[in-house]
């Protein structure tokens, strides 16, 4: 069944930011005579808001910083790295295919506005596809403490699409007719909590540290693929 709308995560799903997160984190760890960064810990951080991910990292590393201090240090370390990000394989073809099928799309990322702008500034050819349907992890419409794995961010993303449809006299799209694309377990949980179907595209480097629960593994509404390259959205 062809989805009526597709909703996307960003980091590690649309663009290759995860390698930069790993690199910048190892730079910080080295500064404090610690490291290397654990992929198991990274897997736990993925999909979380900046503050939640920072708390997980600081608890693991033992570095004596507040979440706010660590986030500021990460931003400083990453400043020159984000401009090197590029779309992951299959992404541009998929977005073009969705456009040709007139399937509306939205972006729901846990990245805050500052990081989103840094990551996307040189990738307008990718993010222009979203027609402004973008919500970040610090969006005021997202209640505090209700980031992924809670479903709220997907409901807000879908509302952006439906508000435009309503203005054009079109019927609203229901959550069960949406397809969410995610690379993290946290994101998969979030999409399913919203009542949406999910395509899980895990990073093969972190896959050994990811595992679906028995219920998730048996969930026919979760489809696992290792790449969006050659992905056929009409056959999910």
Swiss-Prot record:
GO molecular function terms listed in the Swiss-Prot or TrEMBL record: phosphatase activity; pseudouridine 5'-phosphatase activity
This protein's UniProt keywords: Cytoplasm, Hydrolase, Nucleus
Any one GO cellular component localisation term in the record: cytosol
Leader sequence residues: none
Biological process, per Gene Ontology: pyrimidine nucleoside salvage; rRNA catabolic process
Subcellular location field: Cytoplasm; Nucleus
UniProt entry tagged with the keyword DNA damage: no
Enzyme Commission number(s) from the entry: 3.-.-.-
A family per Pfam: HAD_2
UniProt xrefs under SUPFAM superfamilies: HAD-like
Similarity annotation: Belongs to the HAD-like hydrolase superfamily.
Protein name as annotated: Putative uncharacterized hydrolase C1020.07
Organism: Schizosaccharomyces pombe (strain 972 / ATCC 24843)
């Amino acid at each position: 069944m062809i989805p009526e709308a597709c909703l996307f995560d960003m980091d590690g799903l649309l663009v290759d930011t995860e390698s930069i997160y790993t690199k910048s984190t190892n730079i910080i760890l080295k500064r404090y005579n610690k490291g290397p960064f654990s992929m198991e810990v990274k897997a736990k951080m993925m999909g979380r808001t900046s503050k939640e991910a920072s708390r997980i990292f600081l608890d693991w590393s033992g570095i004596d910083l507040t979440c706010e201090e660590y986030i500021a240090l990460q931003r400083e370390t990453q400043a020159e790295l984000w401009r090197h990000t590029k779309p992951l394989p299959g992404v541009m073809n998929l977005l073009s295919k969705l456009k040709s099928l007139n399937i509306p799309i939205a972006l729901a990322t846990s990245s805050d506005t500052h990081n989103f702008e840094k990551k996307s500034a040189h990738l307008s050819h990718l993010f222009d596809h979203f027609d402004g349907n973008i919500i970040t992890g610090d969006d005021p419409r997202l209640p505090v403490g209700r980031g992924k794995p809670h479903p709220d961010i997907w409901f807000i993303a879908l509302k952006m699409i439906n508000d435009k449809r309503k203005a054009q006299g079109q019927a609203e799209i229901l959550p069960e007719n949406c397809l969410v694309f995610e690379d993290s377990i946290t994101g998969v949980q979030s999409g399913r909590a919203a009542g949406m179907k999910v395509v899980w595209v895990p990073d093969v480097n972190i896959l050994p540290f990811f595992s679906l629960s028995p219920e998730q593994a048996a969930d026919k509404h979760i489809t696992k693929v290792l790449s969006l390259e050659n992905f056929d959205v009409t056959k999910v």
